[in-house]
Amino acid sequence: MSDKIRLLEGKVSSVAMDKTVVVRAERYVKHPLYGKFVKKTTKYYVHDEKNECKEGDVIKFKETRPYSKTKKWCLVDIINREK
């Protein structure tokens, strides 16, 4: 396994579950044939122990041990709070 810690940033899209937030992370991928950069979004389930995130916050999260079947990411820091 790699020693490099995977850190990602994304925007919180749902806080409906207890100690879990749903985060959408955007990335740009080059189309293989046409060469145009296309925006792709990926949905991550992130563990939020203190339930401190709100919908619309921009957060930083890292890969960690599996908390459940789908939740393998943990909250590191809240970068920008939604007002």
Curated annotation (Swiss-Prot):
The keyword ATP-binding does not apply. Pfam families: Ribosomal_S17. This is Small ribosomal subunit protein uS17. The keyword ATP-binding does not apply. InterPro entries: NA-bd_OB-fold, Ribosomal_uS17, Ribosomal_uS17_bact/chlr. Belongs to the universal ribosomal protein uS17 family. HAMAP family: Ribosomal_uS17_B. One of the primary rRNA binding proteins, it binds specifically to the 5'-end of 16S ribosomal RNA.
